[in-house]
Every structure is written in C-alpha cells, then in structure tokens.
C-alpha cells in the first residue's frame, strides 16, 4: 500500500491534469485523478471522456520553426501523452496538427485507465484534500464550489475574465513613426512606444473598429466586462471620443516629429525584458483575428508591416496571479503542497496546458524524491512557458494575463535577422539546449522517462 503522504491528488481531467497524472505515474508516483464528469459537466463540455477538446480540434501549427510547433517537438521528445495521442489520431490539416477529437480523448482516457498507479475518481471536488500533494488543473471553467474553495487559499488574486491585448514583434514596428516616451516623463521616461494619430486618422480608425466583425461569444460566456478593462469596440460604441479620453489619450506626450501633442496615440508596453515584443495597451477586443490584423495594420500609423505574436481576445477564464502566488516550481508559496497546472496558472491553449502539466509533474516528482527541480532552459519552448507563468519572462510588476506560447516570451536572440531566419535560429537553439537538458527530466533520447518507483518511498 502506498504511503498516503506520497500519493498525489490531481484535480481536473483536462489536458494539463491528464498529462501531469500520466507523467507522475510513469515515474512511479501513485496518483488519484479527480474529474467531475460524468456526474457534473461545465457548460462547455459534452462528453464523458478525459481531455475533451471543447473549442477546436486543432493543436495549431506543427511547423517546428513556429513557437507552437517547437513546443510540439519538445513534448514529443519528452514522451508526452497528449502529443502521442494527437499523432496517433491525426487528421489532414496542412501543417497544422489537427485530431479526430473523440478518438483523441478516448485514447488518453484509455491510456490512463491502463496506467499502473492511477486511480480515476469521478465527482465534483468542493474542498481540497487536507493532506498530501495536490495539483489543481481545473481549467478556465472551474466549478463555482471549487472556485470558492480556491479563494480561501489565494485570496483576491483569482480572476474570472480574461482580457487579452495583442502583442507585436518589435522588429515589425516602424520606428520612423513610433517614438519612445512615458506620459510626463514618468518612470524611466521612455518606457512606452507611442504611435501618434492625427484627428482624421483617429476617426477613420474608430469607424473601422465600430464596423468590424466581432466574435460571437459562446452561450456560457455572458459578456460581463470590468469598467477598467472594456473592449475597445465597446468603448467606441459609447462615443467616438471615448477612446481618445481613455487608453488612446495623448496627454503628457509630444510627437518629436511635430513638437506637438498628437490627437490620439496607441501606446505599446514592453512585453519581455529583452524588448523583442510589445503589448498594445488597453486594446483588449472581441474583433475577429482577421479584422484585428486588417484594421490595426491599415489604420494605425507605424503598424503597416506589423507581425502579431498574439491576437486580442476576451473570454470567460478562471486563473490566478501566478507570478505573485507561485514559486519557481509552480507550487503555492504559502502552501507548498499545492501546485497549479494548465490554464488556471495563466497559460492559454491545449498544448500549452499539457506542457504546464508536464512541468508540474517534473517539479513534484523532484520534491517527492528529494532531488533538485532543474527547470528547462529559457531558450526552449518549455522553459519560455514556465518563465511566463512565474513572471520571469516579463518586466517586474507586469500584469499577469494568460498567453499562448510565442517567441516573444523566449530568451531573446542577439543581432538583427529576417523573420524566417529568426524563427529558424530560435528553433535550432531550442533543439540543442533541450537535448542537453533532457537528462534532468529523466528522459533518455528515446523519449521514455527513467523509472523511479516512488510507491516504495
């Protein structure tokens, strides 16, 4: 019988929870996987299987010279359950990794049911276990009862709506138009990039935002916006000048080309410490991704050649302020036996959630065996994702928002390169550094973790 103190409870049978449970069990750690289905479902879920894909059957690009494709490759090298199931149930989709979703979920469910040391327990969790390690991987639609329980542990740093502004590659911003300056010279004096607009440019932009195609929310996503974080199109509908007195206000700024205060500005804030990516401040939006690219590139001066590393969006999401709450191993600073994995920690996307679950499994296994958790290098996709969750990829006090993997959160490259060359360089560097790190994950070249039996510990 396993020592109950060494038995890990994983709450949530999505991509993060299933990957975490599988990787722990492969390393000899006994796991109880708690999933509320089939007794109860969130408004988004329809099936009784684990790892249900809700919004899309695509795991996005499989090109290893894209950030997400690089993450796919790293997870394959690590022996990921999710990537193995995806590859086995792939459907034609160009260079995207798309899956037959029912077979994909069934494959993961069957793998875990067959896995020694994994006990699957159905039913809603309303209170966290009082003893032993616990991994919370309940996703963006965490049940109301468990949400109330989590609030007892994390306080006010639990958020319920996800408002994401677009992120741009620094190399794609026209620096002949943009100028560095903070309002009234505050902070460092030049912490922001500013894209100035004339009166005519501003009103043309507003007209396009109001007319642009918007994403229709899911039935379970009743729009309830915070006044301090409204979508730009909602502000524009309140009046043509609302944005000019809000996030686009020009006060305290002077365009060095004219010496005058612009009529309006789009401000960009540094997204990573290397300054390779910039966030469009206050530009959370429900415009479709195609409309965002069209409107922002065509009607904001300086963005005509813009490369979008992340698109803006707003949707229902439950997540914690991980950089302030979690230690470097993704455990809660105030209660180290509690770990957070997946979207609730602030990653966005199926594959990113699985990767986060894998990282938690490594960190927890290290703690249980009394060994050091060696995080993946910041030059790898796995390492970049971890640094996003812990806040290391961003400037101090940067507001935590869920994010997909992008090259903007990687350790930056040096020197100027063309876009294709830069992506190839990121990929080559990551591949080399991951190979050197794999032994720290207990993974030989074949991608199967070396077995350490924790059940007898």
UniProtKB/Swiss-Prot annotation:
Single GO MF annotation: tRNA (uracil(54)-C5)-methyltransferase activity, 5,10-methylenetetrahydrofolate-dependent
InterPro entries per UniProt: FAD/NAD-bd_sf (IPR036188), MnmG-rel (IPR002218), MnmG_N (IPR040131), TrmFO (IPR004417)
CC terms in the record's Gene Ontology section: cytosol
UniProt entry keywords in alphabetical sequence: Cytoplasm, FAD, Flavoprotein, Methyltransferase, NAD, NADP, Transferase, tRNA processing
Record-listed E.C. numbers: 2.1.1.74
Highest rank taxon of the organism: Bacteria
UniProt keyword annotation of NADP present: yes
Cofactor(s), by name: FAD
Positions that bind FAD: 12-17
Gene3D superfamilies: FAD/NAD(P)-binding domain
Catalytic activity: uridine(54) in tRNA + (6R)-5,10-methylene-5,6,7,8-tetrahydrofolate + NADH + H(+) = 5-methyluridine(54) in tRNA + (6S)-5,6,7,8-tetrahydrofolate + NAD(+); uridine(54) in tRNA + (6R)-5,10-methylene-5,6,7,8-tetrahydrofolate + NADPH + H(+) = 5-methyluridine(54) in tRNA + (6S)-5,6,7,8-tetrahydrofolate + NADP(+)
Entry keyword annotation includes Transmembrane: no
Family: Belongs to the MnmG family. TrmFO subfamily.
NCBIfam families, per database record: gid_trmFO (TIGR00137), PRK05335.1 (NF003739)
Stated role: Catalyzes the folate-dependent formation of 5-methyl-uridine at position 54 (M-5-U54) in all tRNAs.
Protein name: Methylenetetrahydrofolate--tRNA-(uracil-5-)-methyltransferase TrmFO
UniProt source species: Myxococcus xanthus (strain DK1622)
Gene name linked to the record: trmFO
């Amino acid at each position: 019988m396993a020592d109950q103190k060494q038995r890990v409870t994983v709450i949530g049978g999505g991509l993060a929870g299933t990957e975490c449970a599988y990787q722990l069990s492969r390393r000899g750690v006994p796991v109880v996987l708690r999933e509320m289905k089939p007794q109860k479902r969130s408004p988004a879920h329809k099936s009784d299987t684990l790892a249900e894909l809700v919004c899309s059957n695509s795991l996005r690009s499989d090109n290893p010279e894209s950030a997400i494709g690089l993450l796919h490759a790293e997870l394959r090298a690590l022996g990921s359950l999710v990537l193995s199931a995806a590859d086995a149930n792939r459907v034609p989709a160009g260079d995207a990794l798309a899956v037959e979703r029912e077979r994909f979920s069934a494959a993961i469910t069957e793998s875990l049911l067959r896995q020694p040391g994994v006990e699957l327990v159905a039913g809603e969790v309303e209170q966290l276990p009082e003893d032993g390690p616990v991994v919370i991987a309940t996703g963006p639609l965490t049940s109301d009862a468990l949400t109330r329980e989590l609030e007892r542990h994390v306080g006010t740093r639990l958020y319920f709506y996800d408002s994401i502004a677009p992120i741009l590659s620094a190399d794609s911003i026209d620096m002949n138009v943009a100028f560095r300056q903070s309002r009234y010279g505050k902070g460092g004096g030049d912490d922001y990039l500013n894209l100035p607009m004339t009166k005519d440019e501003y009103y043309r932009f507003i007209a396009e935002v109001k007319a642009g195609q918007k994403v229709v929310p899911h039935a379970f996503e009743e729009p309830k916006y915070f006044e301090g974080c409204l979508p730009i199109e909602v502000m524009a509908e309140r009046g043509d000048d609302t944005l000019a007195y809000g996030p686009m206000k020009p006060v305290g700024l002077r365009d060095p080309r004219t010496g005058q205060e612009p009529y309006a500005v789009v401000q960009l804030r540094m997204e990573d410490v290397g300054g390779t990516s910039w966030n469009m401040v206050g530009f959370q939006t429900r415009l479709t991704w195609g409309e965002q690219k069209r409107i922002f590139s065509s009607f904001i001066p300086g963005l005509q050649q813009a490369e979008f590393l992340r698109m803006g969006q707003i949707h229902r999401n439950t997540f914690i302020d991980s950089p302030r709450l979690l230690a470097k191993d993704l455990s809660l600073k105030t209660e180290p036996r509690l770990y957070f994995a997946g979207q609730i920690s602030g990653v966005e996307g199926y594959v990113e959630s699985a990767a986060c679950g894998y990282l938690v499994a490594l960190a927890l296994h290290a703690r249980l065996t009394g060994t050091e958790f060696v995080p993946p290098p910041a030059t790898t996709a796995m390492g970049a994702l971890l640094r996003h969750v812990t806040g290391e990829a961003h400037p101090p006090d940067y507001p935590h928002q869920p994010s997909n993997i992008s090259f903007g959160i990687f350790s930056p490259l040096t020197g100027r390169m063309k876009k294709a060359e830069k992506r190839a360089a990121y990929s080559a560097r990551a591949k080399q550094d991951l190979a050197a790190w794999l032994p720290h994950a207990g993974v030989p070249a074949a991608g199967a973790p070396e077995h350490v039996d924790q059940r007898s510990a």
